[in-house]
């Protein structure tokens, strides 16, 4: 703990943005007396200094948009856990994202990723998603549109109740060539018959 001349009593600081090979990081200090914060830059990492990710690690992508879980290090695949900004009305699960400057494919949406989110109104699901966990959209009362770009979903890769609990006012948009197959698939995974599924 550091006490400076103007009376601030700074804590030991928290890394709020990790440094990478391409960008500096940020460390934020908070005054334990008044709550004021100050930031300090963390130098870019040199070659070889990057933390080696392993399967199961939960990290934030370089854009600070999402928390993801490393699914396969060799194939460079991650699982989307949740958005960083819990107040975001529009969320995009991209086809790929960068972690420590390295590109990873986003291939799965974790269980409960948006469960109980009463703010989000639009969710776009990227083309590389091949697996969806349980209760991903349950309780998303303000959700108006889910746009799926993926054509890789199957009975085996979509969890039971993956689409349960979606508001009746939600519309799901899917690639036109998958409309018939996805309608059957989603209903078998808990989707209400009152939710519209449209092709685009």
Regions flagged by a language model, labelled:
Residues 60-115:
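LRR flanking "cap" motifs
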Residues 1-49, 97-98, 105-109, 114:
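Extracellular modular ligand-binding repeats in secreted and cell-surface proteins
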Residues 72, 80, 126-127, 131-132, ...:
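Extended beta-solenoid/beta-helix repeat architectures
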Residues 47-67:
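N-terminal low-complexity, Pro/Thr/Ser-rich intrinsically disordered segments
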Residues 16, 86-108, 118-131, 141-156, ...:
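Structural signature of tandem-repeat unit edges
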Residues 40, 182-185:
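Short, surface-exposed terminal/edge motifs of secreted or surface/virion proteins that either
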Residues 160-165, 184-189:
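A structural signal for leucine-rich repeat
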Residues 110-113, 133-136, 159-162:
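Consensus positions within tandem repeat domains that build extended binding/scaffold surfaces
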């Amino acid at each position: 703990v550091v006490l400076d001349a103007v009376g601030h009593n700074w804590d030991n600081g928290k890394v709020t943005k990790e440094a990478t090979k391409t960008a500096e990081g940020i460390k934020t200090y908070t005054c334990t007396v008044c709550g004021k914060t100050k930031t300090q830059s963390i130098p870019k990492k040199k070659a070889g200094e990057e933390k080696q990710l392993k399967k199961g690690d939960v990290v934030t992508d370089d854009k600070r948009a999402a928390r993801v879980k490393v699914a396969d290090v060799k194939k460079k695949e991650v699982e989307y856990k949740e958005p960083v900004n819990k107040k975001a009305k529009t969320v995009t699960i991209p086809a790929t994202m960068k972690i420590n400057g390295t590109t990873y494919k986003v291939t799965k949406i974790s269980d409960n990723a948006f469960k109980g989110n009463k703010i989000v109104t639009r969710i776009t699901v990227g083309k590389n998603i091949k697996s969806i966990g349980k209760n991903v959209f349950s309780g998303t009362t303000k959700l108006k549109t889910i746009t799926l770009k993926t054509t890789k979903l199957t009975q085996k890769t979509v969890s039971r109740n993956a689409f349960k609990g979606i508001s009746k006012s939600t519309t799901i948009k899917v690639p036109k060539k998958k409309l018939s197959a996805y309608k059957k698939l989603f209903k078998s995974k808990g989707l209400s018959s009152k939710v519209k599924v449209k092709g685009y």
